[in-house]
């Protein structure tokens, strides 16, 4: 962590189609090499595919998926007297959101469909129904925290 000043939070604008800040953050996370228009077409294409397959509001599916992926607790390493303990700590809301977005994108990129639009659509639908590898990642994180509950008194 920096000893100097903390980085300022940047102001981001809501996305043009839905007017949602989280969708903009999601697009920025999907974006590679600064190609925002490509990221935009991937996200909106996936939302259209979700609308077609699930017959539900895509924004609702997206938010449900993020809620199902976001972890409540995680483990952090803490060194005490020569031993390193995995200490379970609560996750701050901003980090919860960031982890959910990151895990969703990673899981979508690992899927086997041909286009990123299809992969993202599949992962969004799976995550909104509490399935898929992004939800499994959250479950594994919670299991780790539960297994190390004995060290929770080392919190800082």
Swiss-Prot record:
Task: Cite the InterPro entries for this sequence.
Answer: Ribosomal_uS7 (IPR000235), Ribosomal_uS7_bac/org-type (IPR005717), Ribosomal_uS7_CS (IPR020606), Ribosomal_uS7_dom (IPR023798), Ribosomal_uS7_dom_sf (IPR036823)
One GO biological-process annotation of the entry reads: translation
Mind telling me which GO cellular component terms the entry cites? Answer: small ribosomal subunit
Which molecular-function annotation in GO is an example for this chain?
Answer: structural constituent of ribosome
SS bonds (residue pairs) = none
Q: Which UniProt keywords apply?
A: Ribonucleoprotein, Ribosomal protein, RNA-binding, rRNA-binding, tRNA-binding
The family database entries (Pfam families) matched by this protein are listed as: Ribosomal_S7
How does this polypeptide assemble, per the annotation?
Answer: Part of the 30S ribosomal subunit. Contacts proteins S9 and S11.
Similarity comment: Belongs to the universal ribosomal protein uS7 family.
PANTHER family noted in UniProt: RIBOSOMAL PROTEIN S7
**Main role?**
One of the primary rRNA binding proteins, it binds directly to 16S rRNA where it nucleates assembly of the head domain of the 30S subunit. Is located at the subunit interface close to the decoding center, probably blocks exit of the E-site tRNA.
Protein name in the entry: Small ribosomal subunit protein uS7
From which organism does this entry originate? Rhizobium rhizogenes (strain K84 / ATCC BAA-868) (Agrobacterium radiobacter)
């Amino acid at each position: 962590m920096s000893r100097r000043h903390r980085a300022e939070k940047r102001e981001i604008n809501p996305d043009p189609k839905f007017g949602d800040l989280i969708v903009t953050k999601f697009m920025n996370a999907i974006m590679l090499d600064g190609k925002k228009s490509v990221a935009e077409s991937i996200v909106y294409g996936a939302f259209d595919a979700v609308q077609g397959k699930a017959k539900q509001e895509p924004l609702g599916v997206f938010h449900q998926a993020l809620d199902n992926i976001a972890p409540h607790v995680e483990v952090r390493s803490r060194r005490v007297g020569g031993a390193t303990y995995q200490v379970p700590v609560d996750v701050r809301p901003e980090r919860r959101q960031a982890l959910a977005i990151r895990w969703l994108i990673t899981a979508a990129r690992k899927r086997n469909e041909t286009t990123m639009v299809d992969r993202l659509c599949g992962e969004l639908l799976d995550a909104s129904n509490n399935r898929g590898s992004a939800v499994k990642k959250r479950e594994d994180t919670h299991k780790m925290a539960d297994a190390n509950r004995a060290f929770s008194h080392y919190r800082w």
